[in-house]
Curated annotation (Swiss-Prot):
Biased composition (Basic and acidic residues): 652-661
Record keywords, A-Z: Chromosome, Metal-binding, Nucleus, Phosphoprotein, Repeat, RNA-binding, Zinc, Zinc-finger
Gene3D superfamilies hit by this protein: 3.30.70.330, Zinc finger, RanBP2-type
Gene of this entry: NRP1
Annotated GO CC locations: chromosome; cytoplasm; cytoplasmic stress granule; nucleus
Region (Disordered), start-end ranges: 389-415, 511-561, 622-661
One Pfam family here: Zn_ribbon_RanBP
ZnF (RanBP2-type) residues: 355-384, 581-610
Annotated positions of the Phosphoserine modification: 345, 455, 630
Name of this chain's protein: Putative RNA-binding protein involved in heterochromatin assembly
Amino acid sequence: MHYVVLELQVAHLPDTPKDQCRIANIAFQIVNAETLVCHYGTNSLPSIEVNGTTKSLESAMVQLDKDIHDVIGNDDFVLVSLYSTWHIRVTLPRQARDDGFILTSYLQHPKVFDLWKEFDRWCVNHPEILGQKKAISNNNCNTKSISINAAKNTKDLDEIVRILEVSIPTEEAGSVPEIYSLLKRTTDILIQLHKKCTSPEDMESVLTKPYDSHTDIRAFLQEKSKILYMNNLPPDTTQSELESWFTQYGVRPVGFWTVKNIVEDTSNVNNNWSLNNSPYVEDQDSISGFVVFQTHEEATEVLALNGRSILSNLANTKQPRVVEHVLELQPSSTGVLDKAQEILSPFPQSKNKPRPGDWNCPSCGFSNFQRRTACFRCSFPAPSNSQIHTANSNNNVNSSRNNLNNRVNSGSSSNISNTAANHPYGAPEFNMIANNTPAALTYNRAHFPAITPLSRQNSLNMAPSNSGSPIIIADHFSGNNNIAPNYRYNNNINNNNNNINNMTNNRYNINNNINGNGNGNGNNSNNNNNHNNNHNNNHHNGSINSNSNTNNNNNNNNGNNSNNCNSNIGMGGCGSNMPFRAGDWKCSTCTYHNFAKNVVCLRCGGPKSISGDASETNHYIDSSTFGPASRTPSNNNISVNTNGGSNAGRTDGNDNKGRDISLMEFMSPPLSMATKSMKEGDGNGSSFNEFKSDKANVNFSNVGDNSAFGNGFNSSIRW
């Protein structure tokens, strides 16, 4: 067994890409692994100069192979390097491909010991050395002139020489060529490190596990793997940059994963510098990751890109600049990816890293600074840690209803971490306080049924999510009591009864709950009476109670709130607080304030309204609907009686129909849908029965079963 100490000298012309550097000199030494005797003397170290004219790289490799086999014959050997591990693994194979020749097997897929890595392994087995290294690092950092370099310099040659007690003779500058000096130093460190390995732990871990590219490529080919390992990437590389880089070479990967920075010294969010896990890389300020391809053949072809450079724009620094890193691509496998899954994360979509306290608007997804109390785009109030109410996701509508009732009755916020833990998709939208910037939000209409008045209305209450599944946002938010919106996941989007139940509970807390079969459920009716009364006092300009015993104690108090914009149309009360600019428009369905450039509503996806009449565009509830019993509703008002028009419990002799806020105001179809008729449901109370387009009048009735909305109602809407 022999060690072949190999050091390469590289020449790089100025103003040329890094992947155009060339091997200029090759120096090597052969050491017997048992006796630690060097084959060549200090004054006769072999060196092969590669100048490109008289000596090409191909002829230099032939000479190197001949000299090695002349000394060791057929004996086993392994490469060792202190400064040239990167060039052996990356630069040498890349230049051989550029020159059009094939390296020998031990250089094409080398087994190499990196002495920096072996020294770190040896220090782990000797805790006293770790304390000594830490003291040295602290002393260096105390020196102001070298504090930055010392903090980033992980390859301290003086440290390894002093700890291993390597005796290096002082030589006059220029007396010995640099390549020989490097080779002599590497050989001395190897011999001294080998002598220091005295404990059983050292014998097991130090100088026993080289970087074995041959084993990696063999496992890659046998498994027909589609996964490659990427190393030496710029620290803030984004997924789009990687996709563009691979696309220019004609390949399209299907997935990217980056290795999280788990080094304690560089885990600070204010530190833009990332320490690479591999000490041999050319740029320590770099990251690594994995790339997945569609086929094994495509991944095999991409291995030829090993050693090519990639450009990245460092934007999150005081001096933005473009950096160039030479990318290392090595074969990998699914087994390696599975073992590393706990430290893997997707590459960022953007270079704009969120700062502590930044928050994403739950209404439009806009990223806001911490100091903003409302969304800069849509004026939606900022949530806070103590204000976010969450509920666990559940496919069973009865369980979802119980969770909603429990949350309303308790009046307290649940722990956001519990919701994120129980959410089937990890709930990235819930963790707005953890500085997680979600990807660009998309509104996936494929998850919704055919657009009907009911399904469209329910879509108004659904915020887009990364997983494509809607998050139902409660509409009883009001600036008066600083309650943040609730989030709830529900998979039963296609069940109209479930949607009605969710919508009505979120808006008015009607206790006549509906199960999946359309049957009424009167549970918890007494528990929510007080909440309904207080809730209607504080939020709504009308009072609705669907319990069998109607409570009208709060009717006279609601007229005072008619000018407070608490009707909660959509999610922003009377709409957005943003001032209207030229061209801005309000959605005719959900009254969302859209910018002029938007051709569809950002909230519900509805088309841009073409009506010029504000009264037809904005579905506001007339204040005459509310107030004392002597006030009569106007013709434009919508009346809903959840008690079947009965005057039971009334003491003033007036009809209930003119006093209750219409629930169906929030279910008005868009104008484009008022020109045709459609049939909804089959008369079993599970959906709307009839939609008539005569003067945009809507006749909602229930045949045979009146459990869909309390006791049923008839209503008409005028735009």
